[in-house]
Swiss-Prot record:
Pfam families: Ribosomal_L27. GO terms for cellular component: cytosolic large ribosomal subunit. GO terms for molecular function: structural constituent of ribosome. Gene3D superfamilies: 2.40.50.100. GO terms for biological process: translation. This is Large ribosomal subunit protein bL27. Residues 1-21 are annotated as: Disordered. PROSITE patterns: RIBOSOMAL_L27. It comes from Wolinella succinogenes (strain ATCC 29543 / DSM 1740 / CCUG 13145 / JCM 31913 / LMG 7466 / NCTC 11488 / FDC 602W) (Vibrio succinogenes).
Amino acid sequence: MAHKKGQGSTQNNRDSAGRRLGVKKFGGEFVRAGNIIIRQRGTKVHPGSNVGMGTDHTIFALIDGIVKFERKDKERKKVSIYPAS
């Protein structure tokens, strides 16, 4: 019985692909209606004026304009779109 014991493969050597979250359009950038501004998990940033929020909390532009990041209150942030004049 001069056999080697079978070499077991490791079970924990896996990782999932990144979800590509984060800010897609930054403050001062021009966006068109429908452009995604932020992809996020939960409401890290809340929608302001002229901005919509998808079912997965994605924030997107409702009008063409300039992106502006603002404070909603002491701890919450919001993003708004103002028409380019």
